[in-house]
Amino acid sequence: MASEPASLRDRVRELFALERDVLVLSVAMFAFSLGFQMASRYLGEYMVALGASAVVVGLYGTFSNVISAIYPYPGGAISDRIGSRYALTMFGFLSAVGFGVWLLAPAFGALAVPLIFVGLVFAQAWKSFGLGATFAIVKQSVPPARLAEGFASTETFRRTAFLVGPLLAAAVFAAFATTDTGSMADAQVVDAFVYVLALAVVFALLGTLAQHVLYDSGDDDFGKAFEGISQVADDLRNLPPELRPLLIGDTLVRFANGMVYVFFVLVVTRFLGVGLSTTLPVVGTIDLSPQAYFGVLLAIEMAVALLTMIPVAKLTRRVGLKPVVALGFAVYAIFPALLIAAPADAGVLAALFAFSGLRFAGLPAHKALIVGPAEQGAGGRVTGSYYLVRNVVVIPSAALGGVLYGGLALPGVGTFAGSPPLAFGAATVVGLLGTGYFLVFGEEFAAVNG
């Protein structure tokens, strides 16, 4: 009888493909993602409240894309060389510093918006620098045929934080709102978001500490030393051929998402201006500003993602990875058009964000399709190479989205009158092109059925 509890734990761990290192990684991802999601999804609103225009918000998104393009490859190479434990510890600490810069930005007056850009250099370190390290840990810990389930375990922990984080942010915004369901004043947005960022700093430090203390680096799979730009070129030339159709389709879909991602919060809080007023048993009447309701919408999105991610990951063992990845791409593509055309109704927005959660169901399969063909010991570099190409192409997407969203006036040239519907409609067209390309030319990873 004494062995029964351990056996039950083993079965639960097996269900989620949670080897020890993957479990530790998942716990760290939960803590860090809790803070990052609370902060990053509201940054467009924060910047506008600090005085930024839509074009500047778009430039912020493009700067984020630059960092996403630059960080993953050296991050993967560092992980392959020094091991995932020390790499992720360093990246996590840098991210906490970035959150702190965002927190202090309003105190610097006219420099507040530029400091948002400075803070991003640090804040995105764990997310982008650590990408190769997180992929490599799963790659070396989980059998090839179960990669989708291994990634599903880390994604489930991370997405659980993505559910809890926005609810915490919503509670903070609700505490600072002075109107029932009307949009908050800019000063109120700034005051509330400073507290959100303080929580983000705490969670980032906790995640970094947990990962460093609990992770067993004895099984780290070390690669060769980084050989400079020539190695980057070699890795790109040697990218497994199965990845090329996925890379092209994925790049188009992510370009589309990048055009509008930083503007989702502005559509809810300022373009549609949708809050929530409802009565619940025991609790009574609840009135949420659009800023607070956006956090609830993000939680709804993540709830759907969590409910579907593990079952869909297991489904890949029957239907393969490609159909699941294509489903995620399709949801990415059509969501912008659906959102911008939605009526200013809280229930409709809740349904749309629930639909958007389906895009995350394909992420574990997508990651398995990326890292599956990689040789052991090179998982970090293959992942970094893939994301390097994708993220370089996606760099201008947010700036383009900002121009289409808010328009642009150039002295001596003229004025381009953009609009939110124009930006979101164009994003859907680009996303559908990427989805169609992958459906026609995408390949399956043979180990799934092997």
Locate predicted features:
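Helix-loop boundary and gating motifs at the non-cytosolic
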Residues: 7-67, 242-297
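C-terminal ends and interior cores of transmembrane alpha-helices
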Residues: 93-110, 330-344
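C-terminal membrane-cytosol helix-exit motif in multi-pass small-molecule transporters
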Residues: 201-221, 434-442
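Cytoplasmic helix-loop-helix junction between adjacent transmembrane helices
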Residues: 119-160
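Flexible cytoplasmic inter-helical loops of multi-pass small-molecule transporters
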Residues: 2-7, 212-235, 445-450
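Hydrophobic core of transmembrane alpha-helices in multi-pass small-molecule transporters
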Residues: 112-130, 347-361
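Helix-to-loop junctions at the C-terminal end of transmembrane segments
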Residues: 71-83, 173, 307-320, 405
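A membrane-interface helix-boundary motif in multi-pass transporters
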Residues: 174-201, 405-431
